[in-house]
A protein has these predicted regions:
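Eukaryote-biased recognition of intrinsically disordered, low-complexity regulatory segments
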Residues: 44-67, 161-165, 169-173
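N-terminal Sec-pathway targeting helices
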Residues: 7-24, 32-34
Length: 330
């Protein structure tokens, strides 16, 4: 009887030891997994950053393109001052020079050149000391002539902005508005933007509501004969455009307002802050992009640039695509 009890106690002791070992092993595994996941999560967390670009003559010359880490609360001026030598006037709120390139004013109707800055492709509506940067923003400074008073309120060269990050952390809804014959081009563009993280819808011109027209980011796809595109073209000077269609030719202007080149056909990509916004087209709320041309083929070709070759429009204000050549305008 005593032997039986001893044997039973030994078995119980051994089972308890095994159970404790299993528990210890499981705890060790859990600790290891938790530590590994923590390390992995830390490695995958990207520090907040913005991209700053400095160009001249509507993006034709590139001085700087750099990704800069931000901690939060930095202004556009703070980051500019971090990457470049600058001088300011009017109490420090207006940039007079960047790396020695200084504002110029010839007087009268002569040359007037200054630094302008864009956030995600939209001409900023506040001074650089006032705009607080958000992670993902593109801060783009360009030095150009503005004697024409054609204020360029939006550019295409920071694509896919502003559809991805908007302005001041707010992104308007985006709609591709297309004519029936450009359904495939619109679908391809929608899929391309969605892959880049943009939330976007599609609709035919007849389906566009007045509210959407005023409040959305719009990408209009059709020929110059389209009613909305024709309305914008008729106000090209007020929208800051240097590309106009006179009913027969696409005409480009240089920065002085002189006729530069004319084309009997070609694809065109233009941008402006939304002129149908009741507040006006310089409130940095939404934009209108126009993907157009004289012929069906012109429009399709322009669409394909955005879908497959958008690196080619980097830093551009607007473009014409003719005879497989991209002309940056102005």
């Amino acid at each position: 009887l005593s032997v039986y009890k001893k044997t039973k106690s030994w078995k119980t002791f051994r089972q308890n030891c095994i159970a404790v070992c299993i528990i210890i092993l499981l705890l060790a595994i859990l600790i290891f997994i938790n530590h590994y996941q923590s390390d992995t999560s830390f490695e995958n967390v990207k520090e907040p950053s913005i991209t700053i670009i400095i160009t001249q003559d509507f993006g034709k010359s590139i001085f700087l393109s750099k990704e800069v880490t931000i901690e939060g609360g930095e202004s556009a001026m703070d980051v500019l001052n971090e990457v470049a030598d600058i001088t300011c006037i009017y109490g420090g709120g207006f940039v007079e020079s960047i790396n020695g390139v200084k504002s110029q004013y010839a007087g009268g109707e002569g040359e007037r050149k200054d630094w302008f800055y864009y956030i995600n492709g939209m001409l900023a509506s506040v001074g650089a000391t006032q705009y607080k940067l958000h992670s993902g923003d593109i801060e783009h400074w360009d030095f150009h002539d503005w004697r024409l008073d054609r204020m360029v309120t939006a550019i295409i060269g920071d694509y896919p902005e502003p559809f991805l990050h908007g302005y001041n952390g707010r992104v308007a809804e985006t709609s591709i508005v297309y004519a029936d014959e450009f359904y495939e081009a619109a679908t391809g563009l929608q899929q391309s933007l969605e892959k880049q993280g943009v939330s976007i819808s599609m609709k035919r011109f007849e389906e566009l509501s007045e509210y959407e027209k005023r409040s959305h980011n719009l990408i209009l796809i059709d020929t110059y004969e389209n009613e909305l595109i024709a309305e914008l073209n008729a106000n090209a000077d007020q929208l800051g455009w240097f590309i106009e269609f006179d009913g027969k030719y696409i005409i480009t202007l240089d920065e002085t307002g002189e006729k530069d080149t004319s084309f009997d056909h070609g694809g065109v990509i233009l941008a402006t802050q939304n002129p149908w916004n009741p507040k006006g087209n310089w409130h940095c709320e939404n934009v209108v992009w126009v993907v157009t041309g004289v012929t069906h083929e012109d429009v399709v070709t322009a669409s394909e640039i955005l879908i497959t070759s958008n690196e080619e429009i980097k830093n551009c204000t607007s473009i014409i695509l003719a005879k497989r050549t991209i002309y940056k305008v102005p």
